[in-house]
Every structure is written in C-alpha cells, then in structure tokens.
C-alpha cells in the first residue's frame, strides 16, 4: 500500500498536474530539491500507482467539442442487466467522457462533450435512450466551466 504523501510529493503532483511535460531540472528548481530526488519521487509515485499516467488537457473548443453536458440517469432494474453493465454500455458511446455510478435519487451521472446542444440531444435520444436499462434522463448543459482538473 502506498505510504502517506509528504508535502514535497504533493507539490510535485500539483506541478505535474499543471504540466506533465515539465522537465526534471525545472521541477527541481521549483521545488528546491535535487534533480535526482525529483526523478526518484516521480518513479516511486508511478510504481505505487499514485500516478497512473501522464496525459494532456485538450482545448475542446478547438476540437469542436465546446458544449459540455451532464446527464442524470435512472437505472431500470427490470432490464435484465445490472447497473454496472448498463454503465459499461453507456461508456462505449462516442461523446461520453465520464460515467459515474452514484448514490441518491439518480443512479448514473454522465459527462458528455459535443459540438453543440443539438449534438448532445442526438447522443441522448439516438444512443443513450436506446440502451436497455436506461430509464428516465435529465440533461443539463453547462454554460461555462470555471474549474476543471485532470
């Protein structure tokens, strides 16, 4: 099991979240620790599974995916599928970026990206509602994203 992260590990993770391509020399200067220590800590964080991968943050507007919507779904238990099976089918739909099984009045929460609201509607009507086990849905289109972390 991973040991508790110290202050330096946490600062290193924050820097890598901002720019995963930051070089070790720059990270060393920012954190005030030797380059060998930065290298060792990154290696350890990867080996312990704390860092799962190094990734990018796309500009979705430039990719013509500037509309973000969140969709709540009620699971239909009479479908013959488990809630997890329904979630896994939903995860295969192009444009669905996140699928969460949640507690409360609703059973699933999705994050969808599309070029516009009409395309979100097509995803909901033509794809999502065709999946067995999907009951009622509520779609909420985001006006603006104030904060989004990777």
From Swiss-Prot:
Pfam families: AsnC_trans_reg (PF01037), HTH_24 (PF13412). GO terms for biological process: response to amino acid. One of its GO terms (molecular function) is sequence-specific DNA binding. Residues 24-43 bind DNA. PROSITE patterns: HTH_ASNC_2 (PS50956). SUPFAM superfamilies: Dimeric alpha+beta barrel, Winged helix' DNA-binding domain. InterPro entries: ArsR-like_HTH (IPR011991), AsnC-type_HTH_dom (IPR000485), Dimeric_a/b-barrel (IPR011008), Tscrpt_reg_AsnC-like (IPR019888), Tscrpt_reg_AsnC/Lrp_C (IPR019887), WH-like_DNA-bd_sf (IPR036388), WH_DNA-bd_sf (IPR036390). GO terms for cellular component: cytosol. SMART domains: HTH_ASNC. Residues 5-66 form the HTH asnC-type domain. Keywords: DNA-binding, Transcription, Transcription regulation. CDD domains: HTH_ARSR. This is Uncharacterized HTH-type transcriptional regulator PYRAB16920.
